[in-house]
Amino acid sequence: MAAGNTYSEEVLKATNWLQDNAQKEAFSYVFKTQKVNLNGKEIAWNNYNKDTTDAEMINLQRGAETSWDQATDMEWESEIDSLTKRQVLIFDSLVKKCLFEGILQKNLSPSDCYWFIQHEHGQDTGYHCHVLLGGKGLQQAMGKWFRKQLNNLWSRWLIMQCKVPLTPVERIKLRELAEDGEWVSLLTYTHKQTKKQYTKMTHFGNMIAYYFLNKKRKTTEREHGYYLSSDSGFMTNFLKEGERHLVSHLFTEANKPETVETTVTTAQEAKRGRIQTKKEVSIKCTIRDLVNKRCTSIEDWMMTDPDSYIEMMAQTGGENLIKNTLEITTLTLARTKTAYDLILEKAKPSMLPTFNISNTRTCKIFSMHNWNYIKVCHAITCVLNRQGGKRNTILFHGPASTGKSIIAQHIANLVGNVGCYNAANVNFPFNDCTNKNLIWIEEAGNFSNQVNQFKAICSGQTIRIDQKGKGSKQIEPTPVIMTTNEDITKVRIGCEERPEHTQPIRDRMLNINLTRKLPGDFGLLEETEWPLICAWLVKKGYQATMASYMHHWGNVPDWSEKWEEPKMQTPINTPTDSQISTSVKTSPADNNYAATPIQEDLDLALALEPWSEPTTPTFTNLHLTPTPPDSAIRTPSPTWSEIETDIRACFGENCAPTTNLE
């Protein structure tokens, strides 16, 4: 250390290194030996100094000897004899071998771990070695496993280095004594309620600075203190005793609070106070991760975060803990997100500029029925966003192979947190539908005695349902998506048909009747289809609210909703969705004029308006400009509806309907 307040580079580096690692968690192990008597043969701590031919062991001992010599204060001569020094160097190499082999057995990289080793001699404990071990992938639940592995490795290496001649039986006995006697111990604490031992994690940098660096070095046989220390960053290996104390002092001063806050705690507040355990913190972190990763089932948890799943499964009552953790996760998603939110967040913004909604399989299915597919998709998103009011159910019905289940299954898979109606469970059909973002009813039939409960759920009411083996549980308003080949509005209880339920059921349904059979090679919907549809609708101004729906389409959808109105007509030579618009009828007197829109690019949402606001451009309020002579006018391509009108005019109204080429 230089004069004044200028500190050596080694001291500053060590202090900064401890600051960077102050709050990192680490296991605290103690390696030790015991005095053993086997058939009259005394084995003490200084009898494990057998010569070795292992090159790695020799290199480790040389490195430890270099640290010992450079850390020795030359102002006095150490009274530690050479045999004791050699024994400590051998123990240092054995401890490092045990650490590296244990890390490799766990498939961890030594470069991802940090450690600190200090050899000491205590008044009551004799020789022992403190080891702090932490790193990426080392969690609290692994502490006892590591202790067992280190204990086995430590006993094996001690037998190999024992200089006392032993028979094979005595070697086995010595190893049993080392393993059963736990010659490698782990810092633990006793739980107040369970009275069990749990691993106690320490703060790596704080433990070194406040505890290990303040100890005095052993220089004589009568004194007690430390022999040698080393770490993974080579920061304390060569520090002399005075420099170690200085590093500890600088670290303490840097972490000393500037002001001391004084608080007064009453006896009642102290009684209510509770220390948050490590287990509680771990569960809270796990729940937060599961919510962020949208894990709603045990299978999803196993695939996305197997480490936390195994950690909980290994604890006492692990199955119940996993079940309760998932229940909190699904409840959080159900209360904070809608099914529409979970779909929309999966949209990739990079794909939206090139996205063509008319090329999606969903819109192709709707186009086969000559429907305005933008209107249908807008209505579906409103229901998924809990904006449909009493009409809280999306009903896909019609013959087989018309695309009902394809769309419903795709939406359900995107939502993830889905509950299924179980018709086979007569007493508890909605047992799986609590704390969900969507309820999926596949191939619905006659609801019979459950019709009243069914109507309440389909209308988005908050009701309580019975669960098997449990008490009743509340179902919050949850959108329902349903597919069926039957007429679910006809309710039969026994042999009696109950027509009074027909109209209430219709009032709760967004009726989408699919009748066109799909070809065999139609395929499934792409994973990105509906997220991009939702994002495209938002971009074009079709918000998933009923106010937006009524603004664009005039009224809320009912059972007999005409999805084909307003019609969507695509010119023959412009098949892109950006040019879809409603046709404008003109009179013969207007043929000499061309309608010029007020804005260059008329928004698609505006083009599909079935009516006009005072500020909405229509044919009557567009700026009309004279057109050039007929020879200079490029005749626009006719639309399919105009072609159909001409054919009907030529062949009469009784001609066969034209084929829908859209």
From Swiss-Prot:
<keyword id="KW-0547">Nucleotide-binding</keyword>
<dbReference type="InterPro" id="IPR001257">
    <property type="entry name" value="Parvovirus_NS1_helicase"/>
</dbReference>
<keyword id="KW-1119">Modulation of host cell apoptosis by virus</keyword>
<keyword id="KW-0804">Transcription</keyword>
<feature type="binding site">
    <location>
        <begin position="398"/>
        <end position="405"/>
    </location>
    <ligand>
        <name>ATP</name>
    </ligand>
</feature>
<keyword id="KW-0067">ATP-binding</keyword>
<dbReference type="Pfam" id="PF12117">
    <property type="entry name" value="NS1_C"/>
</dbReference>
<keyword id="KW-0805">Transcription regulation</keyword>
<keyword id="KW-0255">Endonuclease</keyword>
<dbReference type="GO" id="GO:0004386">
    <property type="term" value="F:helicase activity"/>
</dbReference>
<keyword id="KW-1188">Viral release from host cell</keyword>
<keyword id="KW-0190">Covalent protein-DNA linkage</keyword>
<dbReference type="GO" id="GO:0039592">
    <property type="term" value="P:symbiont-mediated arrest of host cell cycle during G2/M transition"/>
</dbReference>
<dbReference type="GO" id="GO:0003677">
    <property type="term" value="F:DNA binding"/>
</dbReference>
<keyword id="KW-0378">Hydrolase</keyword>
<dbReference type="InterPro" id="IPR021972">
    <property type="entry name" value="Parvovirus_NS1_C"/>
</dbReference>
<dbReference type="Pfam" id="PF01057">
    <property type="entry name" value="Parvo_NS1"/>
</dbReference>
<dbReference type="GO" id="GO:0052150">
    <property type="term" value="P:symbiont-mediated perturbation of host apoptosis"/>
</dbReference>
<keyword id="KW-0347">Helicase</keyword>
<keyword id="KW-1048">Host nucleus</keyword>
<feature type="binding site">
    <location>
        <position position="120"/>
    </location>
    <ligand>
        <name>a divalent metal cation</name>
    </ligand>
</feature>
<dbReference type="GO" id="GO:0039645">
    <property type="term" value="P:symbiont-mediated perturbation of host cell cycle G1/S transition checkpoint"/>
</dbReference>
<keyword id="KW-1079">Host G2/M cell cycle arrest by virus</keyword>
<dbReference type="InterPro" id="IPR014015">
    <property type="entry name" value="Helicase_SF3_DNA-vir"/>
</dbReference>
<keyword id="KW-0540">Nuclease</keyword>
<protein>
    <recommendedName>
        <fullName>Initiator protein NS1</fullName>
        <ecNumber>3.1.21.-</ecNumber>
        <ecNumber>3.6.4.12</ecNumber>
    </recommendedName>
</protein>
<keyword id="KW-1121">Modulation of host cell cycle by virus</keyword>
<dbReference type="GO" id="GO:0016887">
    <property type="term" value="F:ATP hydrolysis activity"/>
</dbReference>
<keyword id="KW-0235">DNA replication</keyword>
<dbReference type="GO" id="GO:0004519">
    <property type="term" value="F:endonuclease activity"/>
</dbReference>
<feature type="binding site">
    <location>
        <position position="128"/>
    </location>
    <ligand>
        <name>a divalent metal cation</name>
    </ligand>
</feature>
<dbReference type="InterPro" id="IPR021076">
    <property type="entry name" value="Parvovirus_NS1_N"/>
</dbReference>
<feature type="region of interest" description="DNA-binding">
    <location>
        <begin position="2"/>
        <end position="275"/>
    </location>
</feature>
<feature type="region of interest" description="Ori-binding">
    <location>
        <begin position="192"/>
        <end position="196"/>
    </location>
</feature>
<dbReference type="Pfam" id="PF12433">
    <property type="entry name" value="PV_NSP1"/>
</dbReference>
<dbReference type="GO" id="GO:0006260">
    <property type="term" value="P:DNA replication"/>
</dbReference>
<keyword id="KW-0945">Host-virus interaction</keyword>
<dbReference type="GO" id="GO:0039693">
    <property type="term" value="P:viral DNA genome replication"/>
</dbReference>
<feature type="short sequence motif" description="RCR-2">
    <location>
        <begin position="128"/>
        <end position="130"/>
    </location>
</feature>
<feature type="domain" description="SF3 helicase">
    <location>
        <begin position="372"/>
        <end position="527"/>
    </location>
</feature>
<dbReference type="InterPro" id="IPR027417">
    <property type="entry name" value="P-loop_NTPase"/>
</dbReference>
<feature type="active site" description="For nuclease activity">
    <location>
        <position position="211"/>
    </location>
</feature>
